[in-house]
């Protein structure tokens, strides 16, 4: 038998034995606990409940009985149900207040404050593969901040493959130009063809920026005038820039243009309206002297005829 009886045995005024069911759960230091349980459920009912349960669940059962008995004593009508309902209503009120506070906070800070910050790739020697794939789509000359600069040696094979498509493109342009020239010649639109391909009506070719004079314009002495520099159109200058850039001139295209030159008429002027030619000094005087020499024989012959008629 224990030296000090438990709270249940002391309240019931009986001896507390070693087999007492209440001794482990109702210590003598807290007699109010057994008073509430005994007042609501009764000692005999509590004994039956504890005997039907395993030892590891008895302590939790005693605590539940105590809480329920205390609530029933404080509120005889609702008991623990009223306390549970009060706690549920209080929880709903707290949730509503929290939602209202969040809405006010969004109104003060703005919608941008709620958006999470963008993902920044880690800076290191080996960036992730997704970041490297995104760098491949960037234009040349753009270096992302925080990334090391990688210098690679030029690949000669890539340069060779890059040059081949350019040559093929030039050949295609030349063949297309020849085909267009033949079509425009058949249509009879020579003036539009001459203006489009850099061929003047006086027989000069301005594809390379120089004019070539016809043989008919040479003097009687057989002296050839030097090539004269002409100011071509914008298309001619662009074509000349492409030819000089690649280091060679498309001779087939020039030959085709020379074949399409119309014959010069007598007395046709070398320069047209809107085209400026820069000839070397002394060429104009040379042509004037040659024309005077050609005109002298007919004049002398006419003078001799007049003298014979007078006699």
UniProtKB/Swiss-Prot annotation:
Which residues are in coiled coils?
A: none
The record places domain LOB at 4-105
InterPro entries (UniProt xref): LOB, LOBD
Which Pfam family is one of those matched by this entry? Answer: LOB
Q: Where is this region: Disordered?
A: 264-311
Task: Tell me its family.
Answer: Belongs to the LOB domain-containing protein family.
Name this protein carries in UniProt: LOB domain-containing protein 10
Q: What is the lineage of its organism?
A: Eukaryota, Viridiplantae, Streptophyta, Embryophyta, Tracheophyta
Q: Which gene encodes it?
A: LBD10
